[in-house]
Design a protein with these regions (language model features):
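Short acidic, glycine/serine/threonine-rich loops at helix termini
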Residues: 7-12, 40-42, 76, 82-90, ...
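Glycine-rich loop(s) and the adjacent beta-strand/alpha-helix scaffold that form part
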Residues: 30-82, 204-205, 209, 262-270
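Glycine-rich phosphate/pyrophosphate-binding beta-alpha loops
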Residues: 246-254, 310-312
Length: 331
């Protein structure tokens, strides 16, 4: 685990680990996600970590910030992970995957992966009553958490407070993989005390015999000001330092993946003496995302939407090859 960014003559020179092992590098890519000084919240309980059972990264934020790079705090949340063997699937509605899907390339090989279904159900007034009883112990509402979370992924307690007139909220039970019984309960992100989460879920018929692997929790973490980056995602202050993902103030898998590929490409090009690779707003959603980050900055976790792209009529799935094949050939 890295604890320090090494800088020589104003440029990145490598990293140092917790075991004081020095790894020299011309470029370093930071994709630390929620691990930088990560702090998890479950009710009044606060646990240091980047994820459940995984240690947070300490000292690295401070190591970078001392060179003049600004940083702040954001938060996100995640739902319980459920043991599928305890679920009454007959009480839920199955949701099969899509069969009429389309690719972004005509050149890829056809690979058929086994498809697993998801399942849907709804909360009810009994669930809401239990959840409301736990609001005084919610870190989101008792002042324990001050950081800003993603606007478009509200916790279940935020849904209750924001939409008190709603008698139910839809939940999606999603398999974590083909070789596990673990399920992700999308729509039930929560930082309420564990006993409140379990008691509330057991009011749903499908979960009356609920068993869980991991509780839902909120997590606070450090991020860096993305306006201090170039469009290549290289730092304007520390040449050779590239950043991607939640450390730039974004939220979402695709957002992180899009930044990761751009940071990786440009780090490799910088090491090999190549020209910088910049994606523009009129040729890709990644270009829109990065341009928004480096020119406007963020005051809440950033998520990509088609409405953010003024060229969205041109940025279609069916013309991705025409837009980007030549760019990929160039690198």
């Amino acid at each position: 685990q890295v604890k320090e960014l090494l800088v020589e003559h104003g440029e990145v020179a490598g990293v140092k680990t917790y075991f004081d092992v020095v790894i020299r590098a011309r470029c370093v890519i930071l994709t630390a996600g929620t691990f930088l000084n990560g702090l998890m919240h479950i009710g009044h309980t606060q646990l240091p970590g980047g994820r459940v059972a995984e240690p947070a990264s300490y000292h690295l934020t401070e190591s970078i910030a001392r060179h003049g790079i600004n940083y702040g705090r954001m938060k996100t949340g995640t739902p319980v992970r459920i043991d599928g063997r305890s679920v009454h699937f007959e009480e839920m509605e199955i949701q099969e995957g899509e069969h009429d899907y389309h690719k972004f390339s005509f050149m890829g090989r056809d690979r058929q992966l086994k498809q697993l279904p998801c399942w849907t159900c709804f909360t009810n007034p009994e669930v809401h009553e239990v959840l409301r009883s736990g609001l005084p112990d919610s870190p989101l509402y008792n002042g324990q958490i001050q950081s800003i979370g993603p606007r478009y992924c509200p916790s279940i307690e935020t849904k209750l407070v924001t939409f008190p007139e709603r008698g139910q909220h839809q939940l999606f039970l999603e398999p974590e993989g083909e070789s596990t019984q673990e399920y992700y309960l999308n729509g039930f992100s929560s930082s309420l005390p564990l006993h409140i989460q379990i008691e509330a879920l057991k009011k749903i018929p499908a979960f009356r015999d609920l068993a869980i692997y991991r509780p839902g929790y909120a997590i606070e973490y450090d991020y860096f000001d993305p306006t201090q980056l170039y469009h290549t995602l290289e730092s304007k202050i520390l040449p050779g330092l590239f950043m991607a993902g939640q450390v730039n103030g974004t939220t979402g898998y695709e957002e992180a993946g899009g930044q990761g590929i751009v940071a990786g490409i440009n780090a490799a090009l910088k090491c090999s003496g190549g020209e910088p690779f910049v994606m523009h707003r009129d040729e890709s959603y990644i270009g829109v995302l990065i341009d928004d980050l480096v020119t406007k900055g963020v005051d809440e976790p950033y998520r990509m939407f088609t409405s953010r792209a003024e060229y969205r009529i041109l940025l279609r799935q069916d013309d991705a090859d025409a837009r980007l094949t030549e760019r990929s050939y160039q690198i």
